[in-house]
Amino acid sequence: MTFTILPAVDVVNGQAVRLDQGEAGTEKSYGTPLESALKWQEQGAKWLHFVDLDAAFNRGSNHEMMAEIVGKLDVDVELTGGIRDDESLERALATGARRVNIGTAALEKPEWIASAIQRYGEKIAVDIAVRLEDGEWRTRGNGWVSDGGDLWEVLERLDSQGCARFVVTDVSKDGTLSGPNVELLREVAAATDAPIVASGGISVLEDVLELAKYQDEGIDSVIIGKALYEHKFTLEEALAAVEKLG
C-alpha cells in the first residue's frame, strides 16, 4: 500500500491560511480554499485534509463553504475543526467528507466519543495534538490552548474504545518547517494497532521519505501544509518519491 500524502487546507474567514504552532493570529493567507483544493487535486492528491479553524477556535464556522468545496472535488476529504457533538458530527459527515477528525471532544467527552466511534467506525479519526511539558507529553484541546491529559492515558482509552485511526501532531512543530517528531510518532504507533497520520513540521522532501519508512510500524500517511504552500517541494515530487518506495 502506498504511503498517503494529505495536503492541508486550513480555513479562516473563508480564506486558506497557515498558522505558526497553531496559534490564532499568526495566519498567513494563501487565497481561497477552493483554489488550493483544486490545485492539490490537479497535482495528484488522493486525499485532502480540511481544517475549519474558526470552528476549532469557537468563533464561527465555514461549514457551507466546506460542503460546497467537497461537492466539487473528486478526491477523498478528511474534515476537522469544531466537531464536538452529534449535531456538528452529522453536519460534517453530511458534507460528503470521507473521514471526520475529532479533537477536543475526544478528550473531554469520553462517553460521547466512544458512542461516535461505535456508530461510525472508520469514518472517525481522533486528532491527538500534544506538547511536551515538564518532560511529559500532554494532549491539547480547544484550538490547542487547553490541557487534555496525559498522552499515553488518552491513547489507551481511545484505543480500547476502538478508535480506527489517530492523527498525531506535535504542536511545537506545526507550521514551523522544523522537521517532524519521528521519535514521538513511532512511539505512538507502537502503542496502538490503529494506523497513524503524521502531522506537523514537514519541511523538506526527506522528511516525507523518513516517515514513509515506518509504514510497516503503522505510520501510513502524512499531512503537509506550509512546506507545499511555501514551495519547499512540490506535491508531484512527494508523490513520485513515495511511489518509488512502493
UniProtKB/Swiss-Prot annotation:
Pfam families according to UniProt: His_biosynth
GO biological process: L-histidine biosynthetic process; L-tryptophan biosynthetic process
Family membership: Belongs to the HisA/HisF family.
Designated gene of the protein: hisA
GO-annotated cellular components: cytoplasm
Enzyme class label: isomerase
Main location: cytoplasm
Known pathway: Amino-acid biosynthesis; L-histidine biosynthesis; L-histidine from 5-phospho-alpha-D-ribose 1-diphosphate: step 4/9
Reaction(s) catalysed (UniProt annotation): 1-(5-phospho-beta-D-ribosyl)-5-[(5-phospho-beta-D-ribosylamino)methylideneamino]imidazole-4-carboxamide = 5-[(5-phospho-1-deoxy-D-ribulos-1-ylimino)methylamino]-1-(5-phospho-beta-D-ribosyl)imidazole-4-carboxamide
Protein's name in the database: 1-(5-phosphoribosyl)-5-[(5-phosphoribosylamino)methylideneamino] imidazole-4-carboxamide isomerase
The protein's Enzyme Commission number: 5.3.1.16
Organism of derivation: Corynebacterium glutamicum (strain ATCC 13032 / DSM 20300 / JCM 1318 / BCRC 11384 / CCUG 27702 / LMG 3730 / NBRC 12168 / NCIMB 10025 / NRRL B-2784 / 534)
Locations listed in the record: Cytoplasm
Catalytic residues (positions): 10 (proton acceptor)
Keyword vocabulary terms for this entry: Amino-acid biosynthesis, Cytoplasm, Histidine biosynthesis, Isomerase
Recorded GO MF terms: 1-(5-phosphoribosyl)-5-[(5-phosphoribosylamino)methylideneamino]imidazole-4-carboxamide isomerase activity; phosphoribosylanthranilate isomerase activity
